[in-house]
Regions:
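N-terminal small-domain helix-loop-helix segment of the aminotransferase-like
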Residues: 2, 9-93, 100
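Short acidic/glycine-enriched loop/turn segments that link adjacent beta-strands
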Residues: 70-71, 230, 304, 339-343
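Short loop segments at secondary-structure junctions
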Residues: 238-242, 268-269, 312-315, 352-353, ...
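PLP-dependent enzyme catalytic core of the Aspartate aminotransferase-like
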Residues: 327-328, 337-368
Length: 368
């Protein structure tokens, strides 16, 4: 007897990158540059550590479930994002949030279009509830976007949901709020899921559109620019009706008190995050400038996120450089989710000093 969910039986799993750093003794991790998961390359705000230590040293509460409605956290998100608390809800990461969205808005055989190649975990989440996922890809040569062709596909297929990672991981494409608004008005019967995991690096958000349109949900995270990946905090911005729908199945007690309080501390020190973003932009500009010396070997695609996609003349050259970087304790992300990125890898951008080290190791590879 096969008890496995019929949608899981032939489901292609999300391919995780190696997380070798956790196999390294903690005292030896300092020299590792982990540039494969688009995490921040610095620690969170010192106020986060101070708050966590305060909790650990204070009266015990770990035997209790966390609060199921943290008004202080909702207020902190509202203050940072500039939207009413009624249009906000927090979750245990945006990955978990995507699962709730799929369970709340998708039924068997519903059509979903992913603008890709993109973050592949969302594809898996949709398919696990029986939705039919197809892709509209950026141009395979240069990852430019054909808006007319995209909209023609939406008009033809009439999807229930469209997923747009903005800026897109791994290609770095960015769509303006004005264009997103155009999509919302042109396709009112389609729910657009805007994944703004990297928005702090990119510029204007589409967040304000949730106050006017009910066919958009924006998801955000503290894992990237706020350097809070280990705390697993994400949040959504949506109409009150859409939040209420997700709330029917949301488990409000699966976010630890430590994570909730750390998130409040991080949001209250948003200037720390903004300073880090500026350092990343500086490091990114330096890296792109230096890679121009290898223009005959490497194509560096422009990006509005804290990462860049690099394409090589051959898969063999790409693989050899990945190994060389790893041998020097620098880990990057091999991209395999689509043929258009098979000769590529993605590099998380860090500070200028960190990117100088990456450039130095790449230089040593090409001087061999």
């Amino acid at each position: 007897m096969n008890f496995i969910n019929k949608y899981l039986r032939n489901l292609k799993p999300y391919k995780l990158a190696s997380h070798k750093i956790w196999a390294v003794d903690p005292k030896d991790r300092k020299g590792i540059l982990k540039l494969d998961w688009n995490e921040a390359t610095v620690a969170p705000s010192p106020k986060v550590e101070a708050r966590v230590r305060e909790l650990l040293d204070g009266p015990g509460f770990f035997n209790l479930y966390p609060t199921t409605k943290n008004d202080r956290l909702l207020a902190a998100i509202s203050c940072f994002i500039g939207l009413p608390e009624e249009n906000i809800q927090y979750f245990g990461s945006s990955d978990v949030l995507h699962e709730y969205i799929c369970r709340s808005f998708l039924c068997e055989d519903d059509k979903v279009i992913v603008l890709g190649p993109s973050y592949d975990n969302f594809r898996l989440t949709c398919q696990s509830v029986g939705a039919e996922v197809s892709f509209f890809n950026y141009n395979k040569e240069d990852f430019t976007f054909d808006a007319a062709a995209f909209e023609a596909v939406l008009a033809e297929k009439k999807p229930v949901m469209v997923y747009i990672c903005n800026p897109n991981n791994p290609t770095g494409n960015y769509h303006t709020p004005e264009y997103v608004q155009h999509l919302l008005e042109t396709f009112p019967q389609t729910l657009f899921l805007l994944d703004e995991a990297y928005n702090e690096f990119a510029g204007p958000s589409s967040k304000d559109l949730v106050l006017k349109y009910d066919n958009i949900i924006v998801t955000r995270t503290l894992s990237k620019a706020f350097a809070m990946a280990n705390f697993r905090i994400g949040y959504l911005l949506a109409s009150e009706e859409n939040i209420a729908a997700i709330g029917k199945i949301r488990n409000p007690k699966n976010i630890s008190t430590l994570s909730q309080e750390a998130a409040i501390a991080a949001l209250e020190d948003a200037d720390y995050m903004r300073a880090y973003v500026e350092k990343v932009h500086e490091g990114q500009a330096y890296f792109v400038e230096q890679m121009a010396r290898y223009a005959d070997r490497i194509t560096v695609f422009p990006s509005r996120g804290n990462f860049n996609l690099l394409r090589f003349a051959s898969k063999e050259e790409k693989s050899a450089l990945i190994k060389h970087l790893a041998d020097n304790d620098i880990f990057v992300r091999e991209t395999t989710q689509d043929p258009s990125v098979e000769s590529c890898f993605r590099v998380t951008m860090g500070t200028k000093d960190q990117m100088k080290r990456v450039v130095s190791v790449i230089d040593s590879f090409y001087k061999k």
